[in-house]
């Protein structure tokens, strides 16, 4: 009996998380939907919505619709690019600190290492 209740609670929790996630995604892009709606209103106001579209009109409409999406992608890519640049710079600085010039040591020189003596 308890196991069945637990399954029900977990199912409800999962369902609520999925629904909240979708609501959050829809709230993040209301501006994009608004732009699409405005573009379609302009098209219907000029009478293009009732006419047959030519290939050029369709291409122009699709390019106008994809502009906000491209801007969103570019923002994401620029942020990803900045983090990638930062990571590469950190790797380079770590590599440069590891590549210290080797010292020229005298023949037969010995250093004490915690496990024993080593040659220089």
Swiss-Prot record:
It comes from the Eukaryota. Disulfide bonds join 109-120. Residues 84-94 have a biased composition (Basic and acidic residues). One of its GO terms (cellular component) is extracellular space. It is found in: Secreted. One of its GO terms (biological process) is regulation of cell migration. This is Somatostatin-2. It comes from Carassius auratus (Goldfish).
